[in-house]
Amino acid sequence: MARRLSILKQPIFSTFNNHLIDYPTPSNISYWWGFGSLAGLCLVIQILTGVFLAMHYTPHVDLAFLSVEHIMRDVKGGWLLRYMHANGASMFFIVVYLHFFRGLYYGSYASPRELVWCLGVVILLLMIVTAFIGYVLPWGQMSFWGATVITSLASAIPVVGDTIVTWLWGGFSVDNATLNRFFSLHYLLPFIIAGASILHLAALHQYGSNNPLGINSSVDKIAFYPYIYVKDLVGWVAFAIFFSIFVFYAPNVLGHPDNYIPANPMSTPAHIVPEWYFLPVYAILRSIPNKLGGVAAIGLVFVSLLALPFINTSYVRSSSFRPIHQKFFWLLVADCLLLGWIGCQPVEAPYVTIGQIASVGFFFYFAITPILGKCEARLIKNSNACEARSVLASFLTSIGLLWW
Amino acid sequence: MGGKYKLKEVTYSLGPDSWEVMRGLWKGAGYKTHKRIHENWVSALTLLVPVIGSYWYAENYREKEKLHHRH
């Protein structure tokens, strides 16, 4: 610290230094805090591989599928680029979901980091849109029919729905105009995600990182380099191994075999299934028998996520010290896993019922968040065991009433 | 950037392998594992029971349906 290269004090380098080298980090952060930088790495991998893929890809309905095959067979290292890009999207979502659940468990969304959380949700939304339109580009059966099903959802919006769908398609069906605008947007959006990520980081660095204890760590900070850098590096190496297993040994396990069949508007696949990372949201969409209701439920998922920091009433951040919340957190994780499983099952009994219960369970977590914080505050206040039991009983009653 | 903090003094010296910190990695592993399980078994149940329970219910339901149609 005493000896610092003078170049790091120059205007541009000082910003770099303040945020990535000498950035004060809580000394007690765990490996779970490494998923943020890992998500940044995933974004870089996706942009780099994407740029090189775009050099060989042709966004035309007659050539798109063939150009992907050309990349796989004729372009030197093309197979690696494509498999890295396709599996990289899945890796990106795995990392971001883990990052999200870490934030949820340790209360990283709580004041004063509301903006960090909200920007994170915006990034997730942008990622979902980017991944969806990216999946359309190979112009396989699942690309075409996935695009048809999902874009048609907008038709559920009253009055302007059909106009929006026509505008999205650039015509009266998913066709060449759709493919071209999706390609254009798929190239643009990652750079918007990168910009939003910088804002996410800037908002984080305004108050500093949270930590597993969820307490103010101003008195115990260490420099990002070399301590946290080395810790992140462990995660990067583990990630590289995990990613490589998919790229080199199971490159198609996360995809759908139907996407190796060229798009055919005259033949609908038996089961139209989105990519695995959309399955929980897809399950919520299908759980509601009404089309507009399903679309509204998807909207409500993101509204709930955005509202979370503002409906939270707990003074304690970390779930390590919130035993009741801890159980609800794990129930939410179980619920999301169930929704993911239901999303890829056919729409029949008993999956419909399980999906509907799991969908209610998802929103139930957000509904009880305000009550939970208040009840826990009372439990902390009343250390008397007897009173604590009565507070717990009233809490359970309120949950019962809410459920009813 | 989170205000002005006094960073802890850093001493650049030997690498972690030379500090022999890795030797402590497995120290008390049994106790640590027991403590983890003891403290988190209820959370583990809240995660596993709904997932496994729902899967078991669905499989059981489908099996019964199959048998019902068969006979």
UniProtKB/Swiss-Prot annotation, chain A:
Keyword Electron transport (UniProt): yes
InterPro entries the record matches: Cyt_b/b6_C, Cyt_b/b6_C_sf, Cyt_b/b6_N, Cytb/b6-like_sf, Cytochrome_b, Cytochrome_b_C_euk/bac, Cytochrome_b_N_euk/bac, Di-haem_cyt_TM
UniProt record, GO biological process: respiratory electron transport chain
Pfam families in the cross-refs: Cytochrom_B_C, Cytochrome_B
Chief localization: mitochondrion
Positions with a binding annotation for heme b b566: 99, 200
Subunit (UniProt): The main subunits of complex b-c1 are: cytochrome b, cytochrome c1 and the Rieske protein.
Protein name listed in UniProt: Cytochrome b
Organism field: Marchantia polymorpha (Common liverwort)
The encoding gene: MT-CYB
